[in-house]
């Protein structure tokens, strides 16, 4: 039976259109990624290209498709020039924080702490929703199962990982198997697998539905401190103190490539959205760009004078940034490899960096007790977020880019709100990893 297109769904970050179609009575989704979309694109040429390449879309869908493309362009053109003001100071924990993370919609976030708990917060009121208790040591690594946001996973120095209901706080499973501390973790975008990385030199894959271990990823010769899935969820990258990163096949648990070349411990790794590239940062003062298919190093980014502590791609994968203990961040154009800007101004090391969903702004968190907001086009520092009394080690934007959270060793978490943002969840959104809301949806019954 031929597939029938039933609905278009819009995804803003990164730009794309999700095709919802029916085949043999089963509803499925297929993304059309528009990662290179710009406001000056020739829309009619783009429409013809999509219709020519995608069998599900016939010529009579052109008007609906045109409207969606214009919606994406309008979203890009929205002014992102607002500054941020302090909204709430949360005396979050009695002991220092370890990490903080938003859910996809941005209405809730979580904080982990040395006090052995994880707390869930309402972003728009600053109130604690509930506390996740049960770990016997530091809660270090935490995450929502975005884009769904209905589960939370916590990784602890007690060697276990716990899976929780994000709405009720109910404990689903305690995942046991690591021999030492768990320091990094992630859900796959499909929310079916959890990956955990440990100081025992291994990573493990766990089944979300059953809580059972699916595989142990063994091969690193030192601690695993970074990991992440690609968008398709079929590959995982791990970064280790053994100077290497590794690519693994999630289905088999086998190592696909060893990414060797750094001359010091790997501190951070990440896939681009398309899943074609991996960036790694190292204490050897460099970051490296790797080809996923071949495992080959495409380029070595030099220029920092001290350890690279964090690396990141923007949502579309067109920009890449490295943050360093030298107090600077370096912003690159991914395709050309050119360093567009060196972001200088912090008086201490930068341990965390994050793009806003639009890829127009960047925040850096520093030991100088401040966060800085940067313009990605000009490299200009737009704002210094001041008020913390100790090192800031965590920072994040929500999905709409109008709220920022910062976590500090002063035991507080601060919520910063864009001056144009309402205190309610921001308007329509879509979601970036395969789940999209029908903000503009066209349905077909033929």
UniProtKB/Swiss-Prot annotation:
Q: Keywords, A to Z? A: Cell projection, Cilium, Cytoplasm, Cytoskeleton, Flagellum, Repeat, WD repeat
CDD domains with a match to the protein in the record: WD40 (cd00200)
* Key word Transcription present: no
| UniProt record, GO biological process | intraciliary transport; outer dynein arm assembly
Sequence ranges of the WD repeats: 92-131, 134-174, 177-216, 219-260, 262-300, 303-342, 345-386, 388-426
An example Gene Ontology cellular component term from the record? cilium
From the UniProt entry, list the residue stretches annotated as the region Disordered.
423-446
Q: Name the job this protein performs.
A: Functions as a cargo-specific adapter between intraflagellar transport (IFT) particles and outer row dynein. Required for efficient dynein-mediated transport into the flagellar compartment.
**Quaternary structure?**
Interacts with IFT46 and FLA10.
Q: What name does the UniProt record give this protein?
A: Dynein assembly factor with WD repeat domains 1
Point out the gene that encodes the protein.
DAW1
């Amino acid at each position: 039976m031929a597939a029938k297109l039933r609905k278009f769904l819009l995804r803003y970050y990164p730009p794309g259109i999700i095709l919802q179609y029916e085949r043999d009575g089963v509803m499925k989704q297929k993304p059309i990624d528009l990662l290179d979309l710009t406001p000056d694109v020739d829309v009619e040429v783009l429409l013809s290209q999509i219709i020519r390449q995608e069998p599900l879309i016939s010529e009579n869908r052109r008007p609906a498709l045109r409207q969606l493309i214009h919606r994406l362009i309008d979203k890009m053109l929205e002014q992102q020039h607002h500054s941020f003001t302090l909204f709430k100071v949360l005396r979050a924990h009695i002991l220092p924080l370890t990490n903080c993370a938003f859910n996809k919609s941005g209405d809730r976030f979580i904080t982990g702490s040395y006090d052995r708990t994880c707390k869930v917060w309402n972003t728009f009121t600053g109130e604690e929703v509930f506390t996740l208790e049960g770990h016997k040591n530091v809660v270090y690594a935490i995450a929502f199962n975005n884009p769904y946001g209905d589960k939370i996973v916590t990784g602890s120095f007690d060697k276990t990982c716990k899976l929780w209901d994000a709405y009720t706080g109910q404990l689903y499973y305690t995942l046991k198997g690591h021999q030492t501390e768990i320091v990094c973790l992630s859900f796959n975008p499909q929310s079916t697998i959890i990956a955990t990385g440990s100081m025992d030199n291994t990573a493990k894959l766990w089944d979300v539905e059953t809580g059972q271990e699916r595989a142990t990823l063994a091969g690193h010769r030192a601690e695993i401190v970074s990991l992440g899935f690609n968008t398709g969820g079929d590959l995982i990258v791990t970064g280790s103190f053994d100077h290497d990163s590794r690519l693994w096949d999630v289905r088999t648990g086998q190592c696909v490539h060893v990414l060797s070349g750094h001359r010091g411990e790997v501190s951070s790794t990440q896939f681009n959205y398309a899943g074609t590239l991996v960036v790694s940062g190292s204490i050897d003062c460099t970051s490296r760009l790797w080809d996923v298919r071949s495992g080959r190093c495409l380029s070595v980014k030099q220029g920092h004078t001290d350890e690279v502590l964090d690396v990141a791609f923007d949502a579309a994968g067109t920009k890449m940034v490295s943050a360093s203990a030298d107090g600077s961040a370096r912003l690159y154009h991914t395709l050309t490899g050119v360093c567009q800007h060196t972001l200088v101004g912090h008086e201490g090391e930068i341990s965390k960096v994050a793009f806003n969903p639009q890829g127009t702004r960047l925040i850096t968190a520093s030991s100088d007790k401040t966060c800085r907001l940067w313009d990605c086009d000009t490299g200009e520092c737009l704002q210094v977020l001041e008020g913390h009394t100790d090192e800031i080690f965590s920072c994040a934007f929500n999905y709409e880019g109008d709220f920022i959270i910062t976590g500090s060793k002063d035991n507080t978490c601060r919520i910063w709100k864009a001056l144009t943002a309402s205190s309610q969840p921001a308007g329509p959104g879509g979601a970036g990893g395969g789940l999209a809301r029908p903000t503009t949806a066209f349905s077909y019954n033929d």
